Amino acid sequence: MSSSFLQLTQVSIEFPTDNGPYVALVDVNLDIAEKEFISLIGHSGCGKSTVMNIVAGMYKATTGGVLLENREVNEPGPERAVVFQNHSLLPWLTSYQNVELAVNQVFKTTKSKAQRHDWIMHNLELVHMTHAKDKLPSEISGGIKQRVGIARALAMEPKVLLMDEPFGALDALTRAHLQDSLMEIHADLGNTVIMITHDVDEAVLLSDKIVMMTNGPAATVGDILNIELERPRNRLELADNEQFNHYRAEVLRFLLDRHKKEVA
């Protein structure tokens, strides 16, 4: 029996192509503790999204597998919620209705209508979006759309929150505000979070561990960096923090080394 909350063991996956099998991942091993915040980082094509899709149950590994609380993951489930870079809100539904859709899917048989309403409002409040509850996606900014997308994911009460470059399309200020909100939510709720990012500073600021992927094809885990910065974290205080800058340099060194090997 595994003692890990979430465990990937010898995960490999290949996809059929006209030129034969494309090997995307080889022997990916990860042990993730409950309530940990993990970032996946690496160059484009290194299999970060593929790892996330396997954990989400949208892809099945060719060999190896995933265990969540010692149960095999082989299909999507409400205990794993995904937030994409594109908010993926349904354009004909209000913010409230977009969250309601997820809540009804998970809780229709276990919560009354009044309880579901309270739960929707609670999750919109978590991301400071109650003021936008009656607005359509076309009526709100990109940052607000992403907040609603996060509320929708949290409303499923997932054990694992999967985030695929959730702030990648946002301006720097909106991104910083959402990073701060995510740190507060993670501290309050204690979800296990796996986030894909290309932003080294974001990874160091948010994470307990940074998983650095080698270049694809046949990508795997190149190194794992434990981030031992005290929480709660303040971005302004960390700007001149020696330990923060050490971690940042370690990740950059790994990425630059991989880039040199690719072009050599």
Question: What kind of region is each of these model predictions?
Answer:
Residues 41-43:
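The feature captures the beta-strand-to-loop junction immediately N-terminal to the Walker
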Residues 56:
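Helix-to-loop junction immediately C-terminal to a conserved catalytic motif
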Residues 64-76, 112:
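Conserved ABC transporter NBD signature motif
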Residues 93-102:
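Short coil-to-helix segment of the ABC ATPase nucleotide-binding domain corresponding to the Q-loop/switch region
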Residues 104, 111-132, 184:
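Conserved ABC ATPase "signature" region
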Residues 135-138, 156:
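Conserved signature/switch motifs of ABC ATPase nucleotide-binding domains
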Residues 150:
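Hydrophobic anchor residue at the start of the ABC signature
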Residues 161-164:
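Catalytic Walker B motif of ABC-type/P-loop ATPase nucleotide-binding domains
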